[in-house]
Amino acid sequence: MQLDNILSQLFENQALTKAESQYFFEQVIQGNVSNEQLAGALIALKVRGETIEEIAGAVEAAFANATTFPTPDYDFADIVGTGGDGQNTINISTASAIVAATLGYKVAKHGSRSVSSKTGASDVLSALGINVAISPQTARQALDENNLCFLFAPLYHAGFKHAVPVRQTLKTRTLFNILGPLVNPAHAKRQLLGVYSPEVLKIYAETVRTLNHQHSIVVYGSGLDEVAVHGETLVAEIEDDKIHYFSLIPEDFGVQRHSIEALRGGEPTENAEKITVLLQGKGEAAHIDAVAVNTAMLMRTFGERNLKANVQRVKDLLRTDKAYQTLQKLAQYQ
């Protein structure tokens, strides 16, 4: 296979096979593609729209070159968004992961520093005093003992660093936004995946189905890569090799509506302060409800289908400081 041929295909608007995509992204990960070539390829893919085969090939390339994580044989999940929704909200997925772990659900959260928003998952966790760069063995220990670990993407997918200058220069969503949530190094087979557009929802669901997940849910929440409390959430639920599409509104979870402005965050320190207050049992109503609906959806991937009951469990918890204790325990893993 020749890199030049693959680039020519992309520039002539031809889709790549899974094998061609895997080859191309392995070349990227190994540092064999120039910034100019990569920028051109990512834009060509974005403008045409990435296919399931192209995304799946990139996923295979990432896993083939990743640092291994000792995957446990018990059930665990991930909750992660593509980012790139441009809304700069507080880190709802990160807070939800901490809450779910406190309720007894094991979560291996995959994430990185922000490239296309103000504050990524690892930015806010660092501000909360968490060492995001712990070894795979220490992270596994945290998952075993504390129901929660954070897997810092650059540690596991070191080759992605070759794409960072291009991503930062382009300042737009690319296949790497799509890729991140799908390449959890622990190989999570239960995931709540947030996407940045309704168009990506279907292609994401189809891609997840090819990756043999047990029970995963893809959501797009009226402009957010999360379950929304300000409007409708489009849902694709992947279970037993079938995809079920439906939509939900805040009332389906038993919560009231809040404006998206009520969820706005900012720099990592600001987001960390808001999340700390929330986990200590003193959160704002909008923050509580946003975390409750997202945690409720994550619980569903473990078979807890009653969303209103799930929300109630979260709200009861967020009247205490138990979730903050989980965060403090996580900070002890160095």
Curated annotation (Swiss-Prot):
- Gene name per UniProt: trpD
Entry cofactor note text? Binds 2 magnesium ions per monomer.
Please name the GO terms of the biological process aspect recorded for this protein, alphabetically: L-tryptophan biosynthetic process
One term under GO cellular component: cytosol
Q: Which NCBIfam families match?
A: trpD
Give the record's family classification: Belongs to the anthranilate phosphoribosyltransferase family.
Q: In which pathway does it act?
A: Amino-acid biosynthesis; L-tryptophan biosynthesis; L-tryptophan from chorismate: step 2/5
Put simply, this protein is called Anthranilate phosphoribosyltransferase
Q: Which organism is it from?
A: Actinobacillus pleuropneumoniae serotype 5b (strain L20)
Q: Which residues bind 5-phospho-alpha-D-ribose 1-diphosphate?
A: 81, 84-85, 89, 91-94, 109-117, 121
What PANTHER family is this protein classified in? Answer: ANTHRANILATE PHOSPHORIBOSYLTRANSFERASE (PTHR43285:SF2)
